[in-house]
A protein has these predicted regions:
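Membrane-helix interface and discontinuous TM-entry motifs in multi-pass inner-membrane proteins
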Residues: 95-108, 182-197, 201
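Long extracytoplasmic/lumenal interhelical loops at the membrane interface
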Residues: 186-222
Length: 240
């Protein structure tokens, strides 16, 4: 991962700009391939088997969508950014992969793609009132989505997020155990590889969204603050 990060950092940013749409198209083809030859696992069809490893195209699309939107707005006059006709292409670029990801189904990644795209549109200069209209439309559509679009497990995730205690041994198990791990880390943590929640299988999926709880248990509040500081440095450096 670190080697790949360094290689990407060494590539001239103009190369990413030139090939942004090509990368997006490749990611889109991979998402379509999931529909045709995708591997099913844990009740979802999200991966493509490449022999040596399985690739999750939605992860590639997270990067490809950012590049494509950045490329589009790079060539858009600033005074034209907020006009409706200049929003058609970005909306299509966003909604097509989101729809494909929702079919897998992968609600979390779909929401992340939407959130990332929204941030880019804001930074590009799209007026806030347009987002207010969009947000109002989404709120109005929530009952319809809940009734007709969301799968049972997706509804469980939403309800569990709002109240993990409703099913502490089922859907809420990971959240409950992650809270225990966060609290047990204390100020300085239990030490590297010494976390009981993470290494005694109380958090069986600790390598996924719950990786932060593993860090908190082993390195405590100080370790968490150190991680936050690194993120802040990256953001500050990006704006500098």
């Amino acid at each position: 991962g670190l080697v790949l990060m360094l290689l990407v950092a060494l590539i001239d940013i103009r190369a990413w700009l030139r090939h942004a749409y090509l990368i997006y198209a490749a990611a889109l083809v991979l998402l379509i391939a999931v529909e045709v030859i995708g591997v099913i696992g844990m009740g979802a069809q999200r991966w493509v088997d490449l022999g040596l490893f399985q690739l999750q195209p939605s992860e590639v699309m997270k990067i490809a969508l950012v590049l494509a939107l950045a490329r589009f707005y790079h060539g858009t006059p600033l005074e034209e950014v907020g006009r409706i006709r200049w929003l058609v292409v970005p909306v299509v670029l966003i909604l097509v992969p989101v729809a494909l990801v929702m079919r897998q189904p992968d609600l979390g990644t779909a929401i992340l793609l939407l959130a990332t795209a929204t941030a880019i549109l804001l930074l590009a200069g799209v007026r806030l009132w347009k987002f207010a209209v969009l947000f109002g439309t989404i709120l109005a559509a929530i009952p319809i989505a809940w009734r007709f679009m969301l799968h049972g497990y997706q509804k469980d995730r939403v309800l569990t997020y709002l109240n993990p205690e409703r099913d502490p041994l089922g859907a809420g198990y990971h959240i409950m155990q992650s809270k225990i791990a966060l609290g047990s880390g204390g100020l300085f943590g239990k030490g590297f590889m010494q976390g009981t929640q993470s290494h005694l299988a109380f958090l069986p999926e600790r390598q996924t969204d719950f990786i932060f709880t593993m860090l908190a248990e082993e390195f405590g509040l100080i370790g968490c603050l150190g991680l936050f500081s690194l993120y802040i440095l990256v953001i500050v450096y990006g704006y500098a």
